[in-house]
Amino acid sequence: MLHRAAQLLEAEFGPQWRTVADMLGTEGLRKRVGKELTSFMAYPERGAGGNSQWRGNCSPEVVAALLRYCLDDKRYYGKDTSTFTLLDPMSGSGTSKAAADRYQVRSLLYDLNPAPAYGKGNWNALKDEVEDSADLIFFHPPYHNMIQYSGNIWGTPHPDDLSRCENYSDFLEKLNHCIRKFFLALRKGGRLAILVGDMRLHGKFYSMQNDLMRMGDFESFLVKGQFNCVSDNRTYKKPFIPIVTEYA
């Protein structure tokens, strides 16, 4: 039955049939009780915004869903949203800007890259102070050294690049330093959304979401499905459990 369904979808939608199948297969989890944001996020179709070729970036729909939730919550309780501000302190290719522009809210984008696509460059999350406050801070750090950014994706190697930490303990210490700094930059009633994943390094499993610092009230735990990963087209003989989720 599934093989026949796949044939029908491919005949109707061509190369996009897998994306259509993924969207249909996850819809029952993505939408419940009239809500567009549930504890399961899945965006097989990435959407427009940022640079899809920038390794490790997330779908702008992730940021948009979190932003929409925060705006809806403020409006429900009769709070003003005219000065709502979204801050992304590791903005990469500028994905968060696309989400902010969609909802016509102010966005602040920082990045260690001296020449980012948008926002303030050469901003060091370990040493520089956050120059403003925000209602929503979306923090999507490197997953340790899975993808090294400085000297690879941009510029030259930087000693304060979290993707170039010597080991996981060093990475976690610096990650938690950033979390503390960003939490203190929140406005009253603000939210810090952290998107992280799990990884295997030299055969050992590391869970960032389990190890990172938690500050304030823990509002929700969201599981996000991963799609269109570089490793999707590889096969491995050794038995292991593939990592196909991230967490916010």
How should each PLM-predicted stretch be described?
Residues 1-248:
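Class I S-adenosyl-L-methionine-dependent methyltransferase catalytic core
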